[in-house]
Amino acid sequence: MNSTMQDSPLSITELFRHGTNVFPDSEIITFEGEQARHTSFAKVAERVNRLAGALRTLGIVPGDRVATLCWNHQEHIEAYFAIPCMGAVLHTLNLRLPPSQLAQIINHAQDRVVIVDDSLAPLLASVIDQCASVEKVIVVGSGAVSGLGETLAYETVIAAEPPTFEWPPIDERSAASMCYTTGTTGDPKGVAYSHRSVYLHSFAVWGTFRLDDTGRLLIIVPMFHVNAWGTPYAGWMVGSDLLLPGRFLQPQGLCDFIQQERPTFTGGVPTILTALLNHVQTTGGDVSSIKTAVCGGSAVPATLIAAYRDVLGIELWQAWGMTETSPIATIAFPPKGTAPEDEMIYRSKTGRVVPGVELRIVDDAGVAVPHDGEAVGEIEVRGPWVTASYYNIEAPEKFHDGWLRTGDVGNIDARGYVQITDRSKDVIKSGGEWISSVELETLLVGHPAVADAAVVGVHDDRWAERPLALVVLKPGASATPDELREFLAPKVARWWLPERWTFVDELPKTSVGKLDKKLIRSDYGQAKYSVVELEATKR
């Protein structure tokens, strides 16, 4: 028996139309250093139409890739809608990649046009001669640029087009946007999101983050990474004011923007949110308008969640996902009826799977194991916004029986709460036992003198691998390896306790704020660290 329901396309065009028609007075607000620029959804929608017309005039047709190399601002939002709604593919370029990788992904995606901020033009100029597919460069901003040949001014090209555009029919399974993984363990790999996946993911973000038209959403998450976690699309769809910090991502700039525009919700990686917390504690900045923040990208220390609650009065939610999952897959809400004193048990977990996504854990043989909170294995995921392959790259080892292999190791309990204990490549295998680098890092950051920490496995003649702990101390604080190991001792098994310690000014991070453990291992192998070695503990 067939249903009687209508079959409407699930496309970004429909999200765009809805936000434009229902919430014309909601605003895009871009911080410009001292003051913010306010533009209504209705006015932005006209500019979206003009941009689509300009790209069509330049010869862009459905399926063509149009890249952006931009900060978070109104013009980037315009590209977020104009490019996919006209049938082309939005390719957001990671502005923190080294030039060699930037050129590699532009060439791999075969971008025909690049929209670039004037402040980022030197980065593009450093690779443009290597990018044969790029035919036109459109520059946002009025700053002088050089090294890019003949360029087009963003405002000039959109001013030449009418404020209306006839959007073509869209196949909901066609590519809408693409993002490349950060490539910490190999070359970056492209993930192409469909209109259908973005549409469905937007509803998941709306429900999971509880967005609506009474709220103001501060998008700190870079728009070059995984569609800024889908927040621009979800926020536009439900009429949330969208607050964009531009290039002003240092704590002082963020605080100034927050104090001026009073957002109610935000999100970011632990590095950014920790820096914001420290700034407020030392300068007294006012972030009281924010009621909720979501944190992801790497494990969120329980101490950070508690500090946001106790110091800032902000409820901090931990979320988990990856480029391949669009990215939202889990969110760490306590179950209904949890006593306040027990909430941290759940808030500090990786989270419970969001509706629409399935998770399982498998052993080394690929066999699913019980969700009992004890059995450990690799986490696999599937769902309508989870990738089934990579763009023009064969990677069969990443896919298993219709599931995406995440490379994360952990367990799932009977209530569906996930606890990631490590990346499969980062698990420390010592004398036949597994040691979780993530758990050691989280515990170390709980020490009052520690600002940041990383743990990696290094060669050991007796045990094959042992943990090396890298520690960043807070300004003015002091701690010794013995003190830190004593702090860990009651919290973990004895064989987990590191013998090798080094203190550093900062930890290497990837372009999206994750620990770069590949670089840490390389630097250790080249003896770049001054390592203190303690006497081994007895097993």
Predicted regions and their residues:
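Conserved AMP-binding/adenylate-forming core of the ANL superfamily
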Residues: 28-73, 77-81, 98-103, 153-156
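AMP-binding/adenylate-forming catalytic core of the ANL superfamily
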Residues: 97, 114-118, 266, 383, ...
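AMP-binding/adenylate-forming catalytic domain of the ANL superfamily
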Residues: 140, 493-514, 533-539
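Conserved beta-loop-beta connector loops within the AMP-binding
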Residues: 356-380, 414-415, 477-481, 516
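Structural core segment of the AMP-binding/adenylate-forming
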Residues: 15-17, 57-58, 85-156, 475-477
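Gly/Ser/Thr-rich phosphate-binding loop
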Residues: 237, 263-268, 277-345, 358, ...
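Conserved AMP-binding/adenylation subdomain of ANL enzymes
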Residues: 199-216, 224-264, 279
